[in-house]
């Protein structure tokens, strides 16, 4: 594969506060279950690319649940959100949409929420001349090639800031 560049990466931390109680004596109505709120939010993250019109990926890759006991209603959850797109503005709009969804869920479930951006790297379009030359070279050598974007972060995104850059992906 020959990527035209690297997607932007936007990382966020989300923390929810609930109310820990014993499972048995606590009625379902009125619970402030931080894990249930997080579960709803995680589904929203998974649905986000379709809602935003595609050409984007998003995931929750990390979650901590406290006290993480089978007989205690969770009172704290921390999870991460990773949004990637070729369009930086679209990724920011996607996060704004999620923030509104998350806030509504937190209010409905009585679980105060804190959200924080932890890392952002803008998309990195590679040098058109170099990318074209890599594609031409593959053709000249009779090698298959695929013009694409890189969804993973690479050092090349930083090299791209100081010099013309291109990458070659080899199937593994």
Predicted segments with their positions:
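Midchain, well-structured core segments that form catalytic/ion-binding scaffolds
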Residues: 1-89
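A structural signal for short secondary-structure junctions
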Residues: 6-8, 52-54, 72-75, 107-109, ...
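Flexible, glycine/charged-enriched surface loops at secondary-structure junctions
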Residues: 25, 47-60, 105-117, 144-149
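A short beta-alpha structural unit
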Residues: 59-69, 79-86, 112-131, 157
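Extended hydrophobic-aromatic, low-complexity segments
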Residues: 72, 90-94, 145-148
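Short amphipathic alpha-helices in soluble, non-transmembrane regions
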Residues: 94-103
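Catalytic-core signal marking the mid-to-C-terminal active-site face
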Residues: 103, 132-148, 171-172
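Zn-dependent metallopeptidase/amidohydrolase metal-coordination segment
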Residues: 145-172
């Amino acid at each position: 594969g020959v990527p035209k560049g690297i997607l932007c990466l936007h990382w966020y931390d989300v923390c929810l506060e609930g109310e820990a109680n014993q499972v048995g004596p606590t009625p379902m109505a009125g619970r402030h279950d931080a894990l249930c709120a997080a579960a709803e939010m995680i589904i929203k993250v998974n649905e986000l690319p379709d809602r935003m019109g595609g050409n984007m990926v998003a995931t929750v890759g990390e979650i901590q649940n406290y006290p993480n006991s089978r007989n205690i209603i969770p009172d704290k959850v921390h999870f991460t959100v990773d949004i990637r797109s070729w369009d930086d503005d679209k990724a920011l709009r996607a996060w704004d949409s999620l923030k509104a969804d998350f806030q509504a869920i937190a209010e409905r479930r009585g679980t105060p929420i804190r959200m924080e951006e932890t890392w952002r790297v803008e998309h990195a379009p590679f040098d058109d001349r170099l990318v074209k030359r890599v594609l031409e070279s593959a053709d000249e050598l009779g090698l298959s090639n695929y013009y694409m974007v890189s969804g993973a972060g690479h050092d090349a995104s930083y090299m791209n800031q100081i010099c013309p850059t291109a990458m070659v992906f080899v199937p593994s």
